């Protein structure tokens, strides 16, 4: 078992220049840090180089050299003028690394399936949105032709917004969200693009309120969770069985555990595959820290001490259960702190309003369960707190590596510096974080609960830093 102590960097242990070098790309791109590029909706995405592995399926040798090289500009893709106008309006200047490799494959004819692994903030959403917009016949504004599935209503609404933003000049583009309470029983689905959650989509098809006969493309975001048999795998299989057999299937996620990848290859047969090296999966630009709490009861006291730092930007506190989220909200509000809690027990419209308040900055501290761990983009988030270490399996005995990665990916987005702080208090939580650190090769910065001035200084240095360097580690001499 890995020892967490061996993965810890105390703030004063290393010189300021001891920053992990960015991995070198092996797909023909230059080394170093890229200029900021836009991800389609949010500006300022910074991409460090990473190794992109491309596995082509069923192509002739002459085709492989072209598709491996990717594209250097959107103009090379032959997109419709209305789509290009949307890209220009969003100041979307050049493809990101994942877009360079994935878009030529996804847009090729005849359509081919794709399994794409790409970490948060690399432009994966814009990649599949461009493909969807290119497949839709806009002369049929009420005929469903594209289906996108997401694990939560929050992510479905976000994807809907991205499609509408990039497709703002696409005449007759209609995008509906198939989430609980959103589709009228009288009219059913009346849009050419549908974004929804699997359960609602399945119900609409069964009630014959969703005509799937002319669907051309299906996208599953956060596919590792959606296809996991402990998650929504059964629902996704049933939905797929209701769709045309020749539908193009695109699977996207930041992580693909091996057991899920095996199933994904059966779900999206003969698919091209694009993925990052295992060592490139941790999110760049996030300083990952660790707080050894004296006991479980002290976690709350330390959380309250962090409140002043949480409100420099926006912060997300991840807890294990809905009950914990509500209880921490109650206690913090009683202590005079302004916080919100969002979890699955809230009604749909209430959840929408809570997330909208958080996005707009009206609410700056959000307590939540894993419902927000995946895919949600709020660019102002500067801190993520793992109040409870993510666990999985019977009795929560195993650390959940993938959920840890998704959680911390809510900060450090679009070129900004972010901080994640994980609380441990006993042997189980200590060992769990130790295994996560060992799995991703993390050097965690230790924060001292008994030296609050030093802790506060170090966290502030990162949050307020304008350097935005990958893997930034605070140092006593780093001002």
From Swiss-Prot:
Bias kind Low complexity: ranges: 17-28
One GO-annotated biological process of the protein: poly(A)+ mRNA export from nucleus
EC number of this enzyme: 3.6.4.13
Enzyme class name: hydrolase
Localization per record: Cytoplasm; Nucleus, Nuclear pore complex; Nucleus membrane
Database matches in Gene3D superfamilies: P-loop containing nucleotide triphosphate hydrolases
Catalytic activity: ATP + H2O = ADP + phosphate + H(+)
Membrane topology: Peripheral membrane protein
Entry superkingdom: Eukaryota
Pfam families associated with the record: DEAD, Helicase_C
Domain Helicase C-terminal as annotated: residue spans: 285-463
Ranges of residues in domain Helicase ATP-binding: 105-274
Function text: ATP-dependent RNA helicase associated with the nuclear pore complex and essential for mRNA export from the nucleus. May participate in a terminal step of mRNA export through the removal of proteins that accompany mRNA through the nucleopore complex. May also be involved in early transcription.
Subunit description: Associates with the nuclear pore complex.
UniProt domain comment: The Q motif is unique to and characteristic of the DEAD box family of RNA helicases and controls ATP binding and hydrolysis.
Protein known as: ATP-dependent RNA helicase DBP5
Species of origin: Chaetomium globosum (strain ATCC 6205 / CBS 148.51 / DSM 1962 / NBRC 6347 / NRRL 1970) (Soil fungus)
Upper taxonomic lineage: Eukaryota, Fungi, Dikarya, Ascomycota, Pezizomycotina
Primary gene name: DBP5
């Amino acid at each position: 078992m890995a020892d967490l102590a061996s993965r810890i960097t105390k703030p004063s242990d290393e010189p300021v220049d001891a920053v992990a070098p960015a991995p070198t790309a092996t797909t023909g791109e230059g080394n170093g840090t890229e200029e900021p590029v836009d991800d389609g909706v949010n500006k300022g995405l910074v991409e460090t180089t990473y190794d992109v592995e491309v596995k082509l399926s069923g192509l002739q040798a002459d085709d492989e050299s072209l598709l491996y090289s990717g594209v250097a500009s959107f103009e090379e893709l032959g997109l419709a003028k209305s789509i290009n106008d949307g890209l220009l309006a969003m100041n979307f200047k050049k493809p990101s690394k994942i877009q360079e490799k994935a878009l030529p494959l996804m847009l090729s004819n005849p359509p081919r399936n794709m399994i794409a692994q790409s970490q948060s903030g690399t432009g994966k959403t814009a990649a599949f949105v461009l493909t969807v917009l290119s497949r839709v016949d806009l002369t049929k504004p009420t005929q469903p032709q594209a289906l996108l599935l997401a694990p939560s209503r929050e992510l479905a609404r976000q994807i809907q917004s991205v499609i509408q933003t990039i497709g703002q000049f696409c005449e007759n583009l209609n995008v509906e969200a198939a989430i609980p309470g959103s589709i009228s029983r009288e009219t059913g689905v009346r849009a050419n693009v549908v974004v929804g959650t699997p359960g609602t989509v399945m119900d609409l098809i069964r009630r014959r309120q969703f005509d799937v006969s002319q669907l051309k493309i299906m996208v599953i975001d956060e596919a590792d969770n959606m296809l996991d048999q402990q998650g929504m795998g059964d629902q996704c299989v049933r939905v797929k069985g209701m769709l045309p057999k020749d539908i193009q299937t695109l699977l996207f996620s930041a992580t693909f555990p091996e057991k899920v990848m095996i199933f994904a290859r059966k779900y999206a047969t003969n698919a091209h595959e694009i993925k990052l090296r295992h060592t490139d999966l941790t999110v760049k630009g996030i300083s990952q820290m660790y707080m050894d709490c004296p006991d479980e009861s002290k976690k709350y006291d330390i959380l309250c001490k962090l409140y002043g730092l949480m409100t420099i930007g926006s912060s997300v506190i991840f807890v294990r259960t809905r009950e914990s989220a509500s209880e921490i909200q109650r206690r913090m509000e009683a202590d005079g702190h302004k916080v919100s809690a969002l979890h699955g027990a809230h009604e749909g419209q209430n959840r929408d309003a809570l997330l909208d308040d958080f996005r707009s900055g009206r609410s700056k501290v959000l307590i939540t369960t894993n419902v927000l761990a995946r895919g949600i983009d709020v660019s102002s988030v500067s801190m993520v707190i793992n109040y409870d270490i993510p666990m999985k399996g019977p009795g929560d005995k195993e650390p959940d590596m993938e959920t840890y990665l998704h959680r911390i990916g809510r900060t450090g987005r679009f070129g900004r510096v972010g901080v994640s702080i994980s609380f441990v208090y006993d042997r189980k939580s200590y060992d769990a974080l130790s295994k996560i650190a060992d799995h991703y090769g993390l050097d965690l910065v230790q924060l001292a609960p008994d030296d609050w001035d030093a802790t506060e200084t170090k966290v502030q240095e990162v949050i307020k830093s304008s350097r935005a360097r990958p893997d930034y580690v605070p140092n006593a001499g780093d001002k």
